[in-house]
UniProtKB/Swiss-Prot annotation:
MF-aspect GO terms: (3R)-hydroxyacyl-[acyl-carrier-protein] dehydratase activity
Origin species: Neisseria meningitidis serogroup B (strain ATCC BAA-335 / MC58)
Active site location: H53
Catalysed conversion reaction: a (3R)-hydroxyacyl-[ACP] = a (2E)-enoyl-[ACP] + H2O
Entry similarity comment: Belongs to the thioester dehydratase family. FabZ subfamily.
Keyword Transcription regulation among UniProt keywords: no
GO biological process per UniProt: fatty acid biosynthetic process; lipid A biosynthetic process
Name of the protein: 3-hydroxyacyl-[acyl-carrier-protein] dehydratase FabZ
Length: 149
């Protein structure tokens, strides 16, 4: 698979199964097979989670930032394997050492930097960092597992 950067949202949907409102990646800006991937998400007030989290003080839920990081990790794995096979999915399989260091609010642009640490028998372990304006917002070790469905 020849990877042309940037990869826009419509093409990300060809790689991972997520769709609105759960697709959390807007663009892939960098990719090195079996090593790293950089993706972005533009956080906007019109996203459904902000209706209740919190109406007077909208803050992006940490679990959605973690989900976005996992989507970036899965995308790195899929691209590294040459693209998505029809019946294969990479599922979020685990998280360690998660740290939340900065709130993310509407108007922010999240930059996800993920690095493949190990890959064995269909399970990848990744170092994942989410940044806003160069500041770390969230960091974690994320595991994704490939499954045939």
């Amino acid at each position: 698979m020849d990877v042309q950067l940037p990869i826009e949202a419509k093409d990300i949907q060809k790689l991972i199964p997520h769709r609105y409102p759960f697709l959390q990646l807007d663009r892939i800006t960098a990719f090195e097979p079996m090593k790293t991937l950089t993706a972005i998400k533009n956080v906007t007030i019109n996203e459904p989670q902000f209706q209740g989290h919190f109406p007077d003080l909208p803050v992006m839920p940490g679990v959605l930032i973690i989900e976005a990081m996992a989507q970036a990790c899965g995308t790195l794995a899929i691209l590294s394997e040459g693209g998505r096979k029809e019946n294969e999915f990479f599922f979020f399989a685990g998280i360690d050492e998660a740290r939340f260091k900065r709130q993310v609010i509407p108007g922010d642009q999240l930059v996800f930097e993920v690095e493949l640490l190990t890959s064995r028998r269909g399970i990848g372990k990744f170092n994942a960092v989410a940044k806003v304006d160069g500041q770390v917002a969230v960091e974690a070790i994320i595991m994704c597992a490939k499954r045939v469905v």
